[in-house]
C-alpha cells in the first residue's frame, strides 16, 4: 500500500481518513470480485489463470486483487501474468517487466508486431481498435495453450458490460451484453471477467491509491471507438442524475424475464394457452410496480449475502 504522509497542521484524525477510505475501498473491491468468482464458478481447484495485463488501470487492479485473493482463497490456484507487446510506437517496454518482477509474479511478455499489420490494412483516419482486438485475441488464445493456462482472466468491469449491452441494443438491434464467463471463439479456453461487478470509478480510485505505473492506451494514435465513448458518457450522465441507476441496470443483467420480452426462441409465445390458474409472475402492465421506486442507499450488489470467496479483514 502507498504511504500516508501527515502534513503540518493536519490532525491525526484527518490524516487517518485516507487510510480509512482506502481500507473501505479495498474491502469493497475484494468482496465484489470474490462474489463474481463465486457466483459464476470462475476459478476451480488447480486452475492456472493467465491474467492479461495491458498496463491499464483495470488489468493492474485485476492482477492486484487476484494476488491478494490467492493468499486467502478456499482453493489452490496459480496465475501467470501475460502482456502482449504489439510494438506500438514509444511503448515503454521496461514498465511491465519491472513492475511484475517487483511483485514476484510469474510473467510472460509476448512480442508480436501487430501494429504494422493494422497500419497497413486499416485506411488512414479509421479506428484500428476492432482489427487490433481480433489479432490480439488470437495471439492470447495461442499463448494460453502454450503456457498450459486453464482460464484466461480479462479486466473488463461493470461499466464495460453495460456499455456493451447498450452498444448492441442501439447499433446491433439485439439484447446482448458481455458475459462474465464464456468459452473462447476457438472452443478451447474458458475466459473469465472477475471485475464484472466492479464499477469503473472504484478501479480509478484503486489505481491512484496503489500508484500503478499506467501505460496510456493511445500510443497507436488510433481514435477511440466513438460509439462506445458516447454510450459511456450517457451512462455517466444517468448515474450523476440518478445515483444507483447503474447498479440497478447491472443487477437487471442477472434478472431476466423472457416471458416479458419478445424472443420466441426463449419463450413459447406461439403455443401459449390460458391455464385457469393465477400466475404471480403474470402480466402486471397496468399495476403500480414497486420495483420502479427510486433505489435505496444500498445497491442490490452491496446488499448481497457474502460468500466464502469474499476478502476478509
Curated annotation (Swiss-Prot):
InterPro entries per record: Rossmann-like_a/b/a_fold, TilS/TtcA_N, tRNA_Cyd_32_2_STrfase, tRNA_thiolation_TtcA_Ctu1
Motif (PP-loop motif): 54-59
Family statement drawn from the similarity comment of this UniProt entry: Belongs to the TtcA family.
This protein's record includes keyword tRNA processing: yes
Summary of the function given for this chain in its UniProt record: Catalyzes the ATP-dependent 2-thiolation of cytidine in position 32 of tRNA, to form 2-thiocytidine (s(2)C32). The sulfur atoms are provided by the cysteine/cysteine desulfurase (IscS) system.
Gene3D superfamilies in alphabetical order: HUPs
Keywords assigned by UniProt, alphabetized: 4Fe-4S, ATP-binding, Cytoplasm, Iron, Iron-sulfur, Magnesium, Metal-binding, Nucleotide-binding, RNA-binding, Transferase, tRNA processing, tRNA-binding
Compartment(s) of residence: Cytoplasm
Other noteworthy facts: The thiolation reaction likely consists of two steps: a first activation step by ATP to form an adenylated intermediate of the target base of tRNA, and a second nucleophilic substitution step of the sulfur (S) atom supplied by the hydrosulfide attached to the Fe-S cluster.
NCBIfam families: PRK10696.1 (NF007972)
Alphabetized GO MF terms: 4 iron, 4 sulfur cluster binding; ATP binding; magnesium ion binding; sulfurtransferase activity; tRNA binding
PANTHER family the record matches: AMINOTRAN_5 DOMAIN-CONTAINING PROTEIN, SULFURTRANSFERASE-RELATED
Cellular component GO terms held in the UniProt record: cytoplasm
Any one of the GO BP annotations: tRNA thio-modification
Pathway per the UniProt entry: tRNA modification
Record note on quaternary structure: Homodimer.
Requisite cofactors: Mg(2+); [4Fe-4S] cluster
Cofactor binding note of this UniProt entry: Binds 1 [4Fe-4S] cluster per subunit. The cluster is chelated by three Cys residues, the fourth Fe has a free coordination site that may bind a sulfur atom transferred from the persulfide of IscS.
Protein name according to UniProt: tRNA-cytidine(32) 2-sulfurtransferase
E.C. no: 2.8.1.-
Catalyzed reaction equations: cytidine(32) in tRNA + S-sulfanyl-L-cysteinyl-[cysteine desulfurase] + AH2 + ATP = 2-thiocytidine(32) in tRNA + L-cysteinyl-[cysteine desulfurase] + A + AMP + diphosphate + H(+)
Amino-acid positions noted as binding [4Fe-4S] cluster in the UniProt annotation, renumbered to this chain: 129, 132, 220
Amino acid at each position: 500500500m502507498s504511504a500516508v504522509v501527515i502534513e503540518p497542521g493536519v490532525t491525526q484524525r484527518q490524516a487517518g481518513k485516507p487510510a480509512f477510505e482506502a481500507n473501505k475501498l479495498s474491502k469493497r473491491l475484494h468482496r465484489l470480485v470474490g462474489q463474481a468468482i463465486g457466483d459464476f464458478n470462475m476459478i476451480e481447484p488447480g486452475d492456472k489463470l493467465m491474467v492479461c495485463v495491458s498496463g491499464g488501470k483495470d488489468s493492474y487492479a485485476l492482477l492486484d486483487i487476484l494476488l491478494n485473493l490467492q493468499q486467502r482463497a478456499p482453493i489452490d490456484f496459480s496465475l501467470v501474468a501475460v502482456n502482449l507487446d504489439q510494438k506500438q510506437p514509444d511503448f515503454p517496454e521496461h514498465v511491465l517487466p519491472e513492475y511484475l518482477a517487483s511483485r514476484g509474479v510469474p510473467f510472460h511478455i509476448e512480442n508480436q508486431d501487430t501494429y504494422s499489420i493494422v497500419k497497413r490494412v486499416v485506411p488512414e483516419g479509421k479506428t484500428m481498435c476492432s482489427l487490433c482486438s481480433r489479432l490480439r485475441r488470437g495471439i492470447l488464445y495461442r499463448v494460453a495453450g502454450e503456457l498450459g493456462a486453464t482460464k484466461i482472466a480479462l479486466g473488463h468491469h461493470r461499466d464495460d458490460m453495460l456499455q456493451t449491452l447498450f452498444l448492441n441494443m442501439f447499433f446491433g438491434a439485439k439484447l446482448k451484453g458481455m458475459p462474465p464467463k464464456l468459452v473462447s471463439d476457438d472452443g478451447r479456453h474458458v475466459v473469465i471477467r472477475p471485475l464484472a461487478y466492479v464499477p469503473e470509478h472504484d478501479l480509478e480510485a484503486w489505481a491512484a491509491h496503489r500508484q500503478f505505473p499506467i501505460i496510456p492506451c493511445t500510443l497507436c494514435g488510433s481514435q477511440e471507438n466513438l460509439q462506445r465513448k458516447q454510450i459511456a458518457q450517457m451512462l455517466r450522465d444517468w448515474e450523476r442524475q440518478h445515483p444507483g441507476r447503474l447498479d440497478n441496470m447491472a443487477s437487471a443483467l442477472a434478472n431476466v424475464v423472457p416471458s416479458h420480452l419478445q424472443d420466441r426462441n426463449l419463450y413459447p409465445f406461439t403455443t401459449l394457452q390460458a391455464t385457469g390458474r393465477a400466475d404471480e409472475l403474470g402480466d402486471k402492465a397496468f399495476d403500480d410496480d414497486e420495483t420502479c421506486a427510486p433505489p435505496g442507499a444500498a445497491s442490490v450488489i452491496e446488499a448481497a449475502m457474502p460468500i466464502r470467496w469474499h476478502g476478509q479483514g
